[in-house]
Amino acid sequence: MAKSREINMNLPSADDLFTTQEERDHKNQEYVKDISIYEITDFPNHPFKVKMDDKMLETIESVRDHGVLVPALVREKPTGGYEMISGHRRKMASELAGKETMPCIVRNLSDDQAVIVMVDSNLQREEILPSEKAFAYKMKLDAMKRQGQRRDLTSVPLAQKFKGKTSREILGEQVGESQDQIRRYIRLTELIPEILEMVDDKKISMRPAVELSYLTKEEQEILYDTMESEACTPSHAQAIKIRKFSAEGRLNEDVLLSIMLEEKPNQVE
């Protein structure tokens, strides 16, 4: 019996069938246009805070007098409108300055590409809180790992492009942090918001905070209440002890209180 031959047919996608070549080319090109600020939604789970501080007041005044000088970066949403990639502060300043539109670069980006570009553009800020780094590094690392499982737009596997380096190694090189420091920052995402805010406010330093991130949410809530009532925070040594009791299933309010009230040589490490 003659061996059947496999027929390879490259069928056009739905996008190819129902759009013109000009429309497809336009979709893959970036362009600048003025967009209503009401058509632009914030990036989902945007890790960087947009605060009303002195710098924001300066930005509002500049936008009021001169407009937005550097266009924001957005991508089109499948459901209509646009999603902000870079320019959340400029958008807020435009709103408060009474502007209806702002100039934007519209770029065609996949979900993972959008995450990476969003993080990279915001890491250029002069001041970045530990919580912002924590969630930004986690979001970018997850996106890089997903890209490593498939081919990117250049059709070259990421592992091949970076000679077998792990995503965490690549991220560390890009942001100037060691792999261990990347891991520590990402651990902070396991903290409850109240304790994470204490890290941002420099009431708890990084090393104790990492140890505390291994506690359950319920244990963290008890710890936070204890810190508030006793007006104290754990040292690194105390945090290690607290984590040990938690791992052994022996951590409760009384144990926490006894550890927190232990004399320590230095309150802040």
Model-flagged regions — what are they?
Residues 169-170, 175, 179-269:
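Amphipathic alpha-helical extensions and coiled-coil-like segments
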Residues 92-190, 200, 207, 214:
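Amphipathic, charge-rich alpha-helical segments that serve as recognition/docking helices
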Residues 17, 62, 118, 122, ...:
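Residues that form generic nucleotide/phosphate-binding pockets
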Residues 67, 72, 144-148, 193:
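Structural motif corresponding to the C-terminal cap of alpha-helices
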Residues 57, 88, 166, 192-193:
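Residue-level marker for well-ordered alpha-helical positions
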Residues 2-107, 113-127:
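Short, charged/polar connector segments at secondary-structure boundaries
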